UniProtKB/Swiss-Prot annotation:
Monomer. This is Aklavinone 12-hydroxylase RdmE. Inhibited by phenylglyoxal and 2,3-butanedione. NADP provides a partial protection against inhibition by phenylglyoxal. Increasing the methanol concentration in the assay causes inhibition of the enzyme. It comes from Streptomyces purpurascens. It comes from the Bacteria.
Length: 535
């Protein structure tokens, strides 16, 4: 890789930035990440990977490694979610009795499961995979400024960077600002934000302690604490003896993070556990703001926003880090398609069209969960929730990269009864291929996928011809010809009948479908791909 020229420059090595880099590198794109810190964050922060994220990480080739590294599920027992006065005190409400409750809600919708890996364990996996495929990272390197241009050398972005050896310019085709809530990239572009704003202020305490005598045997979990002296949360990390306590404070009452001295934090831990005899070893104490904000624009020319730079999500529901991974995947497959000549630049407009609306769903759901579990006075946000499974797996994309055939304004559908309509995830159907049992979802990724009904041989032939003509990878499968559908569910759930076909994007989203044969299938399919790829 040229030290001063790359295809894509990513600013920020959090989940959004590293996901973008990993998915780009896997597609052969020259990508560089710059991170102002000397290394990745050592703190747990966001934890948990939902099934949609695991679907994407399967495509990225790291899902199995994530599951193997999941120490919370692997060694710390079952996972409960409760509202309580304290960990050993009165239980006010049980949200989930077991990890199996969460699995049961989504298992019929996807072949991917859940994982509970914390951010400090996931980020090194993403970075290693990015490096394996040629991606690079420069720690201790700050973005100072950038400018977009279209000159004799072509269109691009020139970034001024400051690294260990001084300042220098780096030229990139595109720049991705994944530099967090206080994004320099976003602020430099003058992009405002909207949303609920600040919800509360919290102090996070990470501590080590043996709580085997405190927790229920064979159980760990997340506790929303409504203690007479404070309100906050308690939860585990990947390390069995490392835990987190988050306590709310009120600046309007003169409270400050500095008030949470080590002695005070030890007292609060004792109250949270209802176990003053515990002697915790404090690892870190940090103040932070819980907020809900979404950037008004996610793209400005050749510059994009991803992760917390694009939206700040309350941590309730564990969706913030997952949304960052989804941002990275969406942006990566579209940038790669444009850079490799498979798509026109108009495809990049669909990043904001799709991910911004998805962010609104995620933020609304996280707000509703926060209100239900921590702030009942915020009942007005409850009705903005569309449901947790619907937010994760039933969302709908609307953009020029989706050729919808209906005018249904609904933003989501029940993922337990998927429609297979354009804009939604391709439904999970168990099939067999070459004697191997798998899901239709396992067929997606690393290019486009066409699923044809039993009488859809012409669509399969068309996919092969159009793929060669346009230089766009399209893998085609036909029910009854190498793809066995024992429940006869593919045609129904994908809405393609016996003679039709469904075209699925690299991210598993249905781009187009028909339930009929075509007089000239190749011409029809080529027209579809040209439209969705802005060719």
């Amino acid at each position: 890789m040229n030290d001063h020229e790359v295809d894509v420059l990513v600013v920020g090595a959090g989940l959004g930035g590293l996901s973008t880099a990993m998915f780009l590198a896997r597609q052969g794109v020259r990508v560089l990440v710059v991170e102002r810190r000397p290394g990745l964050s050592p703190y747990p922060r966001a934890a948990g990977q939902n099934p949609r994220t695991m679907e994407l990480l399967r495509i990225g080739g790291v899902a199995d490694e994530v599951v193997r590294a999941d120490d919370i599920r692997g060694t710390q027992g079952d996972f409960v979610i409760r509202l309580a006065e304290s960990v050993r005190g009165e239980i006010l409400r049980t949200v989930s009795e077991s990890f199996d409750d969460m699995v049961a809600a989504t298992e019929p919708c996807t072949p991917a499961g859940w994982a509970m890996l914390s951010q400090d364990k996931l980020e090194p996996i993403l970075l290693a995979q990015a490096r394996k495929h040629g991606g690079a990272i420069r720690f201790g390197t700050r973005l100072l400024s950038f400018r977009q241009h279209d000159d004799d050398a072509g269109a691009g972005v020139t970034a001024r960077l400051a690294g260990p050896d001084g300042e220098y310019d780096l030229r990139a085709g595109y720049l991705v600002g994944a530099d967090g809530n206080r994004s320099l990239v976003r602020e430099s572009l003058g992009i405002g934000r909207y949303g609920h704003g600040t919800l509360t202020h919290m102090v996070g305490v990470i501590f080590d302690a043996d709580l085997s005598g405190i927790m229920e045997p064979g159980t760990t979990g997340w506790y929303y604490l409504h203690h007479p002296e404070f309100k906050g949360t308690f939860g585990p990390t990947d390390r069995p003896d490392r835990h987190t306590l988050f306590v709310e404070y009120d600046p309007d009452e003169g409270e400050r993070p500095e008030d949470f001295t080590p002695q005070r934090c030890v007292e609060l831990i004792g109250l949270a556990l209802d176990a003053p005899e515990v002697k915790p070893e404090l690892v870190d104490i940090q103040g932070w703001e819980m907020a809900a904000r979404i950037a008004e624009r996610w793209r400005e020319g050749r510059v994009f926003l991803a992760g917390d730079a694009a939206k700040v999500t309350p941590p309730t529901g564990g969706m913030s880090g997952n949304a960052a991974v989804a941002d990275g995947f969406d942006l990566a497959w579209k940038l790669a398609a444009v850079l490799q000549g498979q798509a026109g630049a108009g495809l990049l407009d669909t990043y904001e069209d799709e991910r911004k609306v998805a962010a609104e769903l995620v933020v609304a759901e996280a707000l509703a969960i926060y209100a239900q579990r921590m702030a009942p006075h915020m009942a007005e946000v409850w009705d903005k929730s569309v449901g947790y499974p619907e937010t994760l797996l039933g969302f709908r994309y609307r953009s020029s990269a989706v050729l919808a055939t209906d005018d249904d304004p609904a933003r989501v559908e029940n993922p337990l009864t998927p429609s297979g309509r354009p804009g939604f995830r391709g439904p999970h159907v168990l099939v067999s291929r070459h004697g191997e049992r798998l899901s239709t979802v396992d067929l997606f990724g690393d290019g486009w996928t066409l699923l044809a009904g039993e009488l859809g041989a012409d669509w399969v032939a068309a996919a092969e011809a159009v793929s060669a003509e346009l230089g766009v990878p399209v893998r085609a499968y036909r029910v009854g010809a190498g793809l066995t559908d024992p429940e006869s569910a593919v045609s129904e759930r994908y809405g393609i009948g016996k003679a039709g076909a469904s075209l699925v994007r690299p991210d598993g989203i249905v781009a187009w479908r028909t339930d009929e044969a075509a007089a000239d299938a190749a011409q029809t399919l080529e027209g579809v791909l040209r439209r969705v790829l802005d060719r």
